[in-house]
A protein has these predicted regions:
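Protein kinase-like catalytic core scaffold
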Residues: 156, 214-215, 259, 272-274
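A long amphipathic alpha-helix within ATP-dependent nucleotide-binding catalytic cores
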Residues: 224-273, 294-312, 319-321
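Extreme N-terminal starter segment of soluble prokaryotic enzymes
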Residues: 12-17
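Rossmann-like NAD(P)H-binding beta-loop-alpha module
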Residues: 129-153
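Glycine-rich phosphate/pyrophosphate-binding beta-alpha loops
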Residues: 277-290
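Phosphate-binding site of ATP-dependent enzymes
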Residues: 165-251
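Conserved N-proximal alpha/beta basic substrate-recognition cap immediately N-terminal to
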Residues: 21-132
Length: 322
């Protein structure tokens, strides 16, 4: 069978889309890094994108890209919305990938990470240490889990299935603390509460880009919620080989080009992966590291764009029987 090369070609000049709901520090950082690399960024909100009908059926509609596709699509953020809105936004990303546009991170990765139950499953399947977790629709089943764990003095954390930055978390130490189904959108995501003990509320955020841990920070929480958005103090941290390898393996388990991996240590000293974020913010991390995170992200993003023309040509030749 004839094989064709997928070696990276020279970076073409052109424009790339950056999906972001509103301009912020991250968009300025990404924009500067893209311009420095010779790429013109076009910032779009998903609210202004969609699919447009015509004589040929339905086609992808991206403002400013009526005549050509973007070289690539960097997904900085997907704003909260209804189930239908989020489905449409992910559909746009799926369509871009089907059209051969490199999407960073693509819809498949975002779907795996935004749904905490899928993340937990993939981490477990990859053999990575992660806290025991239950995802249930039945209130009776959730109450049975809480009773069993409470009887063994193992508190649980109730998390929104979709959510980030520590919002909506609740510590469940007994059955009375479990809210009704309508308060959790009909799904109970329950995870073992992990603590080092002695009132030490801390965890680590490791930033992985292109399969490599490039920066990390230690977060000291004012409570058991250790997110920077919840007031945690962040400081520079140099992860050892074990933590680096764990973070890199977690990003690989979900297929992420870049990811923020949250790691915690239990009372026995074992490291556990709590979550993998496919659209992580990095402003807090940038304040405590010398690594130019936006430039590293853009370099990895552009390497995927450079590979795309050869990959598309190879696929076309294969379909043609060449």
């Amino acid at each position: 069978m004839k094989r064709c090369s997928t070696a990276p070609s020279a970076m073409p000049a052109g424009r790339s889309v950056v999906f972001i709901d509103r301009p912020d520090w991250h968009s300025r950082q990404l924009g500067a890094a893209l311009v420095k690399s010779g790429i013109q960024p076009v910032f779009l909100s998903f609210r202004n994108c969609g699919f447009a009908g015509g004589a040929g059926g339905s086609r992808l509609h991206l403002p400013s890209f009526q005549e050509e596709l973007p070289l690539g699509a960097f997904v900085r953020s997907i704003a909260a919305g209804s189930f239908e809105q989020v489905t449409l936004r992910l559909g746009i990303l799926h369509a871009l990938r089907e059209l051969g546009v490199p999407v960073y991170n693509d819809a498949r990765v975002i779907e795996r990470c935004v749904d905490k139950s899928t993340t937990s499953f993939l981490l477990h399947r990859a053999g990575l240490p992660t806290p025991p977790t239950w995802t249930l629709e039945s209130e009776a089943a959730a109450r049975a889990v809480v009773r069993a764990e409470a009887s063994a003095a193992r508190p649980l954390v109730l998390k929104p299935l979709f959510g980030s930055q520590g919002r909506g978390l609740a510590l469940i130490e007994n059955e009375a603390a479990l809210p009704p189904p309508d308060a959790v959108s009909g799904v109970y995501y329950l995870q073992h509460f992990v603590s080092e003990g002695s009132g030490r509320w801390r965890d680590w955020r490791v930033f992985v880009v292109g399969g490599r841990a490039i920066a990390a920070m230690l977060r000291h929480g004012v409570s058991w919620k250790t997110n920077a958005a919840q007031g945690a103090a962040c400081e520079a941290f140099e992860p050892d080989g074990q933590m680096r390898a764990l973070a890199e393996a977690a990003a690989e388990a979900v297929g992420a080009g870049f990811a923020g991996v949250d790691i915690i240590r239990d009372a026995s000293g074992r490291l556990l992966v709590l979550e993998v974020n496919s659209n992580p913010a990095w402003s807090a991390l940038q304040r405590v590291t010398r690594t130019r995170i936006s430039e590293v992200l853009v370099a990895d993003f552009l390497s995927r764009i450079a590979e795309a023309p050869a990959t598309r040509a190879c696929n076309a030749a294969t379909r043609a029987g060449g």
